[in-house]
Amino acid sequence: MPERDSEPFSNPLAPDGHDVDDPHSFHQSKLTNEDFRKLLMTPRAAPTSAPPSKSRHHEMPREYNEDEDPAARRRKKKSYYAKLRQQEIERERELAEKYRDRAKERRDGVNKDYEETELISTTANYRAVGPTAEADKSAAEKRRQLIQESKFLGGDMEHTHLVKGLDFALLQKVRAEIASKEKEEEELMEKPQKETKKDEDPENKIEFKTRLGRNVYRMLFKSKAYERNELFLPGRMAYVVDLDDEYADTDIPTTLIRSKADCPTMEAQTTLTTNDIVISKLTQILSYLRQGTRNKKLKKKDKGKLEEKKPPEADMNIFEDIGDYVPSTTKTPRDKERERYRERERDRERDRDRDRERERERDRERERERDREREEEKKRHSYFEKPKVDDEPMDVDKGPGSTKELIKSINEKFAGSAGWEGTESLKKPEDKKQLGDFFGMSNSYAECYPATMDDMAVDSDEEVDYSKMDQGNKKGPLGRWDFDTQEEYSEYMNNKEALPKAAFQYGIKMSEGRKTRRFKETNDKAELDRQWKKISAIIEKRKKMEADGVEVKRPKY
């Protein structure tokens, strides 16, 4: 066996007298135990592709070397790494003794480095009684300085990133800490001396016979003015509530603490109230002096007359259609939807009222234009020119009810000219009282005034119904949940009728063409023209009969 693994080695030679080339003799020879041992000692031939095999471990070399034994080398390596691990554990133990887990201390609440800062930050602004201005200012300044130093210096003296002896800020901080410690030590030394010098309470030296006397003494000599808490000044603290929020009923209100400069002091409020009272009294006295005896008391009769002459004041309220505000603590979403629906309806009503007012203004303007045109037309007519009924249309906006007014006015104009007969076919029986003596006057000048019927024409007071017009609201149509029950919603959907706005501006386009709003007015106008033709024919007939000497019956009122 080779001494080293890297040295090449060969198989041992065959025994003497053994012919390997002759297979027959090999099979015929008898093998003994010695041959079997030699066969076992012969190593196996390594394949060409495999690396050379190592020597057998159980075969001992001629001279044993501990460095060449793999087991010995492994034992040495294990012991070496065990020593390194032990040294590392000892070093970590030494570091752990010097190391402080600050995160764990903060979690446990035992961090000693920031006790002073935490004490100031937690108790400076939460006192039962408000401190004085100087104490408040000094505490706030000290707290602000500690915060800035902690941010700038990166912690306390032991763990700061600044270099000792080179940073001026660190030097100032160390000096301030030394000065504060010396001051605290001096106060602690002086405190026992002051306690010893403190006298006893004078109340203990005085003997009181009654409890009333003791209470009087305490009220006179030991009463102290209570210090006010600055947070409870008038107007200092207020509640902030978001009214636009849908869940404002259940939300917790936010408290707002105003600055002391924004809050008025008690002295200023008292002075202001006193000045207001004095000024109001002086104003009242001066008004009495200016009026003198004019403002004397009236007698009962004069007082009654004065009250009768005084017109009643109109109660003008610009918000009369809105209603009173009734706050409620619990509102369901259904109530909120109902209120929104009512608000939308009120907005629509206001829009409709404005549109109606604009339409009335336009109608008045058109009426003025018609009056001016009639005046000009009247000036152009000749004095004895007869009216052309068929050629000149009349602008009458009134419906069929305007005929009664027209006949009544004609009766007043032509009273006494002729009798009343044959007009029953034109009028209803109940209209006879209104017509009166249609031809009462014989000296009628109706034919001399061709523009009389134009003067009698009046416009209709009927307004266009804009309730069905689509106002163009952006809030959209009403849905099922805007109504309380299904019946109300069904009734609304059955009666809903909305026309586009263009239908009221340009009319509705039908099969025979576009018909505007004047369509109904032209029909009334044609009906009025037909009735006027019949009345004119009756007037002519009565005139001829009266000219021929035929007696004509006159109606009685």
UniProtKB/Swiss-Prot annotation:
Just give the chief location class: nucleus
What start-end ranges are recorded for coiled-coil regions in this protein? none
Q: What induces it?
A: Up-regulated during mitosis (at protein level).
| Modified sites of kind Phosphothreonine | T485
Q: Where is the signal peptide?
A: none
A molecular-function term among this protein's GO annotations: identical protein binding
Tissues in which the UniProt entry reports expression: Ubiquitous.
* Spans annotated as 17 X 2 AA tandem repeats of R-[ED]: 342-375
Q: What is its quaternary makeup? A: (Microbial infection) Identified in a complex with SMU1 and influenza A virus RNA polymerase subunits PB1 and PB2. Directly interacts with SMU1 and with influenza A virus RNA polymerase subunits PB1 and PB2.
Give the protein name, as stated in the record. Protein Red
